[in-house]
Amino acid sequence: MMKIKTAFGIAASVALALPAMAYAAADQEAAMKDSNNWAHPRGQHNNQGYSALAQINKGNIKNLKMAWTFATGVNRGHEGSPVVVGNMMYIVTAFPNNVYALDLNDNQKIVWSYFPKQDPSVQAVLCCDNVTRGLGFGDGKIYLQQNDGLLVALDAKDGKKVWEVKNTDPKVGATNTNAPHVIKDKVLTGCSGAEFGVRCFIAAYNAKDGSLAWKAYSTGPDAETLHDANTNKDNPLYNALSVYQDVNGGNKEGGSFKRLSADQIKGGEKELGTRTWLKPQAIKDGWQHGGGSVWGWWPYDARTNLVYYGAGNPSVWNPDVRPGDNKWSMTVTARDLDTGVAKWAMQMTPHDEWDYDGVNEVILFDKAGKTYAWHHDRNGFAYTWNANTGSLIAAEKVHPFVNWANNVDLKTGVPDKLAAASTHQDYNAKGICPAALGTKDQQPAAYSPKTGLMYSPLNHVCMTYEPVESKYVAGQPWVGATLTMFAGPDGVMGGFAAYDPMTNKKVWYNKEKFSAWSGALTTASNIVFYGTLDRWFKAVDAQTGKELWKFQVGSGAIGNAFTYGNKGKQYVGILSGIGGWAGVAMNLGMTTDTDALGAAGGYKELTKYNAAPGGGALNVFSL
């Protein structure tokens, strides 16, 4: 651990200590050593969403007041958070992804701005609202991943374009919503488009000039998924051709899948990114349009040089027309940063039948001399792995209402699916929990090294799910399912909870009327901040969950809470501007229950709390 002094005299521990800095993003590493900055999309490379700042505490939080606001001039969903380095704050908006640089020492004056010229038609290809999830900083540059696929490097001082590279092509349905992640001499970015039959990937570009360093696809041959002979060496059962036995025809109506035990599974198989896509597929060689979107928040451990991320759902949502386990969709992977080669990869929802997108963030934490990787998956289970080997330590339901599977085998990582929850073409499966947007969607959880707990926003939403026939056409939606959504058995649509990451047992739980769609922030004063769809910005006690403070902002808050220090004062903030999957139907005036992939019906009451479309704004508070 490195000990630093903040401007407030706090001794701050920077977890996952780094070796000597001799690479492009040395300025980013230096900035992250000072807790007054927020130089990474989640604060630090470990993705914890934690700050050592503690000026705002339980004793004085009642005095927290609005310090300043900034209207972005753009409507609809504002996710992610700004980047703060020294006296400069950098903000990106929803489409068209305008960037503003504000001087915190000069009344938040706009020092420079950048306005991308994007084709408005790109908006029609964005799956779940016009969102983007933040900016990257390093090597004297601000990195912008535009919705239209352009990755752009801007000079942090004046906003002038340094380089740009085309990462995805909206003409075939491939877009971007992720924040670029700057790590050492590379900029990592991903790909969205599983609802358009896009074969997605994670890519690393050289920070200096934008040249491609490596690209790893979510599906396909080992040479293209960057799996080698040593991938999953510590857990060969993760490399299995099949982990289920078909029951009553498997993919046929009335069929289901029985989990194989560890001694029944043959591990150590190769070329699984093609061989687990069995015939007949909806389209020849289905893996070539296999989805596996990558757009979350990706941690990095300099001690092992591993970067971690989740890949999303397979295309198409109709499971009957893509038999097989469909690797490596629905998978958390650890890759070598320099080469992209996978050290380990575990598929969480083999042969997905519910769109339980596996893209959610991974969080790294240390305990008793070991490093662990934690992930709250949309499928309703929280997973804890040995971060170096990929061995599964714990996997538990985050809430009792999860009813598609009983449990997860810790030896194989395979869930025990329930036959009653299987979905089939032209059959309307009812009462499945969670809904396709999962027990948690894009909203990242946070970890506190002070309490040793994870803090997670929650969706408590169930669904009906009916797969339907759908033909692939490049650049057109390719979903293949009809959904409706409704509140879970708790009678609410969301919540916020604390978990012990070594067991994934719940410590405390607060109900929320709607899904908590905002990313969480933890601080050294044992306070947790998050936002809600009914416009509240809240602070709760990290140890008990007791509400300490709240303020109602102008639109639903789906951004990530963040904090920074300036001139001896701590500030905490959040972006508001309702949207995302939960809010897109309201923004577009959709009223049929099945619109917006079921969100229109499930979230119809949002119109009682929000004007549409939601106006984007940054809300900043201090004592």
Predicted regions and their residues:
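Beta-propeller domains
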Residues: 260-266, 270-382, 386-391, 396-400, ...
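N-terminal cofactor/phosphate-binding cores enriched in small/glycine residues
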Residues: 44-168, 523
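Short loop/turn segments that connect beta-strands within beta-propeller blades
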Residues: 103-107, 155-158, 206-209, 337-339, ...
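Repeat-blade elements of multi-bladed beta-propeller folds
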Residues: 38-42, 77-98, 124-150, 175-199, ...
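Aromatic (tryptophan-biased) beta-strands that constitute blades/sheets of beta-rich domains
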Residues: 25-72, 109-124, 160-169, 211-220, ...
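Blade-level signature of beta-propeller repeat domains, shared across WD40, Kelch, NHL, RCC1
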Residues: 562-623
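Repeat-solenoid scaffold signature
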Residues: 175-212, 219, 353-408, 421-433, ...
